[in-house]
């Protein structure tokens, strides 16, 4: 199976695709697994199962599935694009770039491939090339707030702060609730927000449909803006709210770390190490 036909998806795969689109992973997973029991060589189903694995953070499983799909169908560009994304998510930017270069060789005008390549280059210090790619993407698709924000990150990194601010502002104009763009502005130490900015952030923070990450970044940005104005109590109320959200996300429990440190202090005494002096050397000699 060297290629993948897009027009002949069987009903079980169409149902699984709809479930994936709607975020109903509990429906998509059994459909895909049952289908693959009947036809374990269908690269389309394997790619869809890989996408499901990636959505729940099982990136290694997703990678293995995608490599299998590409063994079966080397020209399956959707699977290769998914593989590049999974590698990028695992901080394996050089490997992601290799896949993206292959994709762009056959689909040179694909803005999604160019956008991901720009992000991967940014992780490797290829800032100028990344900027060029972002400019190409934005010329073709100018209404993408997160791309404008990523472009702003690259501009800021190379010292083009004024251009970076313009890019962040463009992102915010397209999506006023984009918390990371507001925080990126706040994180510029010379930035001072106007009354209109604070009003816009406050309105965005009150949005009922606000994503958790947007909320916490808006809290941090509002905290910085209000602190700069001397409104300390209001500022730290926002800092506290943002940190509470972040702590809930990470599941960090300081008492667990404290207990481990206390146990280590109790166990790892000078006498403990003296009793075991030379153990590593003896093991190396007898190994």
How should these model regions be labeled?
Residues 1-287:
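Alpha-helical solenoid repeat scaffolds of the TPR/TPR-like class and their adjacent stem/linker regions
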């Amino acid at each position: 199976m060297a290629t993948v036909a897009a027009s002949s998806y069987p009903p079980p795969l169409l149902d699984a695709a709809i479930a994936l689109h709607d975020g109903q992973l509990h429906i998509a997973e059994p459909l895909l697994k049952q289908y693959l029991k009947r036809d374990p060589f269908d690269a389309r189903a394997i790619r869809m199962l890989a996408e499901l694995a990636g959505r729940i953070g099982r990136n290694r499983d997703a990678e293995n599935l995608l490599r299998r799909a590409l063994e079966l169908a080397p020209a399956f560009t959707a699977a290769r694009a998914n593989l590049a994304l999974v590698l990028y998510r695992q901080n394996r930017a050089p490997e992601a770039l290799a896949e993206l270069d292959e994709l762009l060789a056959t689909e040179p005008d694909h803005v999604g491939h160019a956008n991901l390549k720009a992000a991967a280059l940014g992780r490797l210090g290829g800032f100028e090339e990344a900027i060029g790619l972002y400019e190409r993407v934005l010329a073709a698709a100018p209404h993408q707030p997160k791309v404008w924000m990523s472009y702003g990150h690259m501009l800021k990194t190379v010292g083009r702060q004024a251009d970076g601010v313009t890019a962040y502002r463009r992102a915010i104009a397209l999506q006023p609730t984009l918390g990371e763009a507001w925080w990126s502005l706040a994180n510029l130490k010379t930035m001072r927000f106007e009354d209109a900015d604070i009003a816009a952030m406050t309105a965005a923070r009150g949005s009922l449909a606000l994503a958790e990450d947007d909320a916490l970044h808006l809290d941090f940005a509002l905290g910085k803006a209000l602190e700069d104005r001397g409104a300390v109590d209001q500022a730290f109320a926002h800092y506290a709210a943002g940190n509470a959200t972040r702590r809930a996300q990470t599941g960090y429990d300081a008492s667990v770390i404290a207990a481990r440190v206390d146990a280590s202090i109790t166990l790892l005494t000078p006498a403990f190490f003296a009793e075991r002096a030379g153990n590593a050397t003896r093991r190396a000699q007898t190994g």
